[in-house]
Amino acid sequence: MKEKDLKLIQGDSFYLTLNKLDKEGNEIGFVEGEEIVFSAKKNLKQPEYDIYSDKMTLTEEGKIILYLSPVDTNIKLGTYYYDIQYKTLNKDIYTLVKGELEVVWEVTDE
């Protein structure tokens, strides 16, 4: 599991491409039926998510593109805690990455 902080603009679309690697660091690709979930909370103890998305696209190369819509990212400015979880075909769950998510302001509101 890796730690990485992210920054996104409030109310904007956000895409993140994920690669699947084996233990030696070689890219092996995701397969149909595997799942990725992005979730974020302002407070780790709160029961509800501020962002929750399982919207993803599997590319021909075996990469997953995770998508957060403008509705997903239209939350209060500030720092949140996030993680990205991976669910295997066997329903095992692994946290791939976690960190702080900073939601920053925007000027144009469309």
Predicted region positions:
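Contiguous segments within soluble domain cores/interaction surfaces
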Residues: 1-110
